[in-house]
Design a protein with these regions (language model features):
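ATP/NTP phosphate-donor binding region
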Residues: 1-90
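Glycine/threonine-rich beta-strand-loop-alpha-helix active-site module
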Residues: 74-130
Length: 130
């Protein structure tokens, strides 16, 4: 086996009542320009959308809604454009695995000049990410 180092700084939090207490500080420690990535209608039906946007009202939220199950590369490209054009500081994923996976690629794609599909297919290398 080759020597390697793996470091995963993704911060995933679960639990009752944690959102109200922890979300703002967890996000704002990275900056004020936030890309808020989420999926379908359940986030709004559940009231979670209103909670998140209310808690982060003093930050500059840019939204990327509608992340599909097994996200389409066009959604990732749209996210890459937003993180670059809006000079996003932090990507906040609220949803399931597809939303989280999309957000991870989008965060990596901010500093990548090529097509984010390269990052998915392991042809691209980025040394920086959000």
């Amino acid at each position: 086996m080759k020597n390697f180092r793996f470091q995963n700084k993704t911060d995933i939090r679960f639990g009752t009542g944690r959102l109200d207490v922890e979300l703002h500080d967890a996000v704002s420690q990275f900056g004020s320009r936030v890309l808020f990535v989420y999926g379908g209608h359940s986030i709004k039906k559940s009231g979670l959308y209103d909670t998140v946007t209310g808690l982060l009202a003093d930050l500059q939220l840019t939204e990327l809604p509608g992340i599909e199950p097994n996200p389409k590369i066009d959604s990732i490209r749209a996210g890459q454009k937003l993180v670059k054009d809006q000079d996003i500081d932090v990507v906040l994923a609220v949803g399931g695995g597809s939303v989280i996976d999309a957000a991870k690629v989008i965060a990596s794609a901010k500093f990548y000049e090529g097509d984010p599909w390269d990052l998915v297919k392991d042809r691209g290398v980025t040394r920086r990410k959000l």
